[in-house]
């Protein structure tokens, strides 16, 4: 049976060795920092993807507005659904890969007699819900036309104190607008 002095010495030696041993401290430190690091990383990635999707929507809006401005959409007699499926989101396009074109892309095309008559209302109501009152009126030669496209982008990194949603249901409304005067086609 060891003496009490010997057991105290062995406890002291054990504590001394424990203080000197640094193995595993990196794992503990990483476990403390990792959740914050990954939350920040995912928030940055999600923000970048939202900006990229917004830029794609802007590009698609400009391209499809050009078809209206030159009269090609009017000559083809597109309906709103045909315009969306054949011009905005044709199969294999980046927009058709990135967006849910069937149910998620909203197109609003309105024509006016002059730029002073143009009125653009918000598509978000007081309860942060999307207002779907889209029209398709590409106008005729010389008309002022405003083309707006919307997409409700779902967000995933919202519960970590970083929330860029502007719609209910953790969604961000992406919007792109083009205003122009139709050419005399």
Model region roles, listed by residue range:
Residues 1-8, 63-185:
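Short, conserved structural patches
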């Amino acid at each position: 049976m060891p003496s009490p002095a010997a057991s105290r010495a062995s406890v002291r030696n054990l504590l001394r060795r424990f203080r000197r041993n640094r193995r595993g401290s990196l794992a503990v430190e990483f476990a403390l920092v990792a959740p914050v690091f990954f939350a920040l990383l995912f928030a940055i990635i999600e923000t970048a993807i939202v900006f990229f999707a917004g830029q794609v929507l802007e590009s698609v809006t400009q391209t499809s507005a050009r078809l209206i401005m030159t009269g090609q959409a009017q000559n083809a007699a597109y309906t709103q659904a045909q315009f969306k499926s054949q011009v905005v989101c044709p199969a294999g396009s980046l927009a058709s890969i990135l967006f849910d074109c069937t149910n998620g892309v909203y197109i609003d095309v309105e024509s006016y007699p002059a730029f002073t008559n143009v009125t653009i209302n918000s598509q978000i109501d007081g309860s942060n819900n999307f207002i779907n009152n889209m029209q398709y009126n590409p106008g005729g030669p010389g008309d002022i036309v405003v083309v707006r496209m919307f997409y409700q982008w779902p967000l995933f990194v919202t519960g970590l104190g970083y929330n860029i949603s502007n719609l209910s249901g953790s969604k961000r409304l992406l919007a792109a607008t083009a205003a122009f005067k139709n050419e005399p086609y």
